[in-house]
Amino acid sequence: MTALNELTLAEARDGLKAKDFSAREIAQAHLDAIDRAKALNAYIVATPDRALKMAEVSDQKIAKGEARPLEGLPLGIKDLFATQGVHTTAGSKILEGFEPHYESNVSSQLWRDGAVMLGKLNLDEFAMGSSNETSAYGKTISPWRRQGSDAPLVPGGSSGGSAAAVAAHLCLGATATDTGGSIRQPAAFTGTVGIKPTYGRCSRWGIIAYASSLDQAGPIARTVQDCAILLGSMAGHDPRDTTSVDMPVPDFEAAISRGVKGLTIGIPKEYRVEGMPAEIQRLWDQGADWLREAGATIKEISLPHTQYALPAYYIVAPAEASSNLARYDGVRYGLRVPGKDIAGMYENTRAAGFGREVKRRIMIGTYVLSAGYYDAYYVRAQKIRTLIKRDFEAAYAAGVDAILTPATPSAAFGIGEMASADPVEMYLNDVFTVTVNMAGLPGISVPAGLDAQGLPLGLQLIGRPFDEETLFAAAQTIENAAGRISLPKAWWA
């Protein structure tokens, strides 16, 4: 029999409904797995008491025939989401000891639907990073390893804890956020599925902000179906978030069986970047073949402003971050380092509380917003953002239903491999994903194969605004063709 923590979310839902096991049993199985996997450092804090109490409520609901959509399903929460009464840090020392008195909209909707909270998941500090190496609470280690090697690998970032926990069976699914690829890149690195919904599909209320015009919540899970189930509960209008869109939430799970017959899938020629590894190119071609064989038409398209996306993103995102992070001053919550006066306290607190990468991005953002540089950098980057959005609009107006690209330019790299490199080398991990955020579109990463060293590789599908259903249908087609990617033996247990 499959261990309870190794079930997919859909299988666990069906098993609980059939009373094959209890919510308490599956919660305990995951808590035991978390205890055995401390070496991965996927969780900043586990919440066993809360999990078991929530599971008991779920068992009572199931016994009465009152089960809700996610009844009794154990989930992990990225530590960027405010959770009432539970330590919430954004992976930063500056929020040490912070326990919110409120719950994020996304997590509250998961609890409304009966899900069980296992704990808070590790991440790059303030979601700034592509490797989960910048967390003040230690690096998260990927459960994957290269064949014949014990060298630790990164799980990707910033949602590295979410991706590692899902891949290692430490939760059935997890919340995550995506500002420039922080759901899709770690999902690709860990053989999991991650969707960044359309900007405005999920409320940002109660999520610690990085770059407000780019941030969007979404799920990471082990299958396309599991992601669809979770997004159905996470999405929805919230009047407390002015960017939240007031429109019905579709039945995402039903969409996975639609297939792709009659769809036109675009292949953007600009994504064939110089130096792309041959195995990434082969996988991309294979993905197009799978979709063609399932009845889709494959069409080469042009997204001419793609080359400007990454530099524009690394102007817009730090600019917004420098503004958002100005609120952390040691006065009302979190870390406080005394100074000779109030200005000294601000300076000392921020110097001690923020890590190196966060400081770098605050400084970049402050620079591009400063007098004399605002027009030259920030305004120009926003104009490029508009051009990128228009490129996608033109492709969709010409009849393209979704766009297929690689999710990442490589498989997972080793812990510390990029630590001393030029920061731009790390930023290049987002080369295939940032355009989606800049244009506010939905994008999904789905596992599609392994590289020569046995590490997962993912493909990305990009959709029309608020057409996540087509992405789920196409992603399910790829998942069916590629097969589920199984994690090798648990070396950490």
Curated annotation (Swiss-Prot):
Chemical reaction(s) catalysed: L-glutamyl-tRNA(Gln) + L-glutamine + ATP + H2O = L-glutaminyl-tRNA(Gln) + L-glutamate + ADP + phosphate + H(+)
Active-site residue list: K78, S158, S182
Role, per record: Allows the formation of correctly charged Gln-tRNA(Gln) through the transamidation of misacylated Glu-tRNA(Gln) in organisms which lack glutaminyl-tRNA synthetase. The reaction takes place in the presence of glutamine and ATP through an activated gamma-phospho-Glu-tRNA(Gln).
Gene3D superfamilies: Amidase signature (AS) domain (3.90.1300.10)
Family named by the database record: Belongs to the amidase family. GatA subfamily.
Example GO BP: translation
Subunit structure as annotated in this protein's UniProt entry: Heterotrimer of A, B and C subunits.
Enzyme class: ligase
UniProt keyword annotation of Isomerase present: no
Name of the protein: Glutamyl-tRNA(Gln) amidotransferase subunit A
Enzyme nomenclature, EC number: 6.3.5.7
Keywords recorded for this protein, A-Z: ATP-binding, Ligase, Nucleotide-binding, Protein biosynthesis
One Pfam family matching this protein: Amidase
PROSITE patterns: AMIDASES
GO molecular function: ATP binding; glutaminyl-tRNA synthase (glutamine-hydrolyzing) activity
Presence of keyword Ligase: yes
Gene (UniProt): gatA
Source organism superkingdom: Bacteria
Gene Ontology, cellular component aspect: glutamyl-tRNA(Gln) amidotransferase complex
UniProt-listed InterPro entries: Amidase (IPR000120), Amidase_CS (IPR020556), Amidase_dom (IPR023631), AS_sf (IPR036928), GatA (IPR004412)
